[in-house]
Amino acid sequence: MIPEPRDALAVPMRPAGFCVGPGHMVVYGNAAFVAEFGDRCVGLPAREGMLGLPADAFAVLDAVFASGRPLARWIRRDEEDWRLTAAPRVDPETDETIGVAFHLRARSDTPILRAAS
């Protein structure tokens, strides 16, 4: 099966990014992230740049960085429920957690379904 182009799926791109260190300095944000939080957010600690997220969101990033285990939870922002999913990024040489990758998805988003092969 040939993958359909993203536009054909009619799925909006959602904010995703990568942060490093215990202060969660944002080093990458996709186009949706930059549109949502601004281009100046990249290079700032997440708590300073990702305005509008509740404290629970940063507690998830803290827990993932400290434990080295992925986590997800529902958060409330802009009167809507969003799913924050975060996964540790590990240095392959030292096996230390060096950062956290994360993305946000609205509860109202339609699940992406793939045809069975």
Task: Please report, for each region that a protein language model flagged, where it lies by residue.
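Short, surface-exposed beta-strand-loop junctions and turns on beta-sheet-rich folds
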Residues: F33-A35, V90-D91
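PAS and related sensory helical modules
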Residues: V34-M50
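Sensory coupling linkers of modular signal transduction proteins
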Residues: R89-S117
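Terminal output helix/cap of sensory domains in signal transduction proteins
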Residues: G49-D78
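PAS/PAC sensory module
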Residues: D81-T85, A101
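Sensory modules in modular signal-transduction proteins
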Residues: M1-V34, S117
